[in-house]
């Protein structure tokens, strides 16, 4: 249910955003995303399955990037995620988005 809410929010952000999906994923490097993923998988487990913490494995790259940008700008509220996203630049977000989108989802 929570994953659906996140996806719905991200779709609205993508539709309302002046930045295209291409811009959200500009500079993406899957290898760099894998390198950066260590902090993410501390909470979002490698298997992508955890009670209470949404799975990010297999999440559409555009959705992932939109959600991370929403946390970064404060449009979505969650203290930990705002802190994490706030430390990432656009290339890092894009690289993480592409990396996690290529992992098998938990659904």
Where are these regions (language model features)?
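Bacterial N-terminal signal peptides
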Residues: 7-16
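Residue-level hotspots at or immediately adjacent to binding/recognition sites across diverse folds
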Residues: 21-22, 46, 84, 99-101
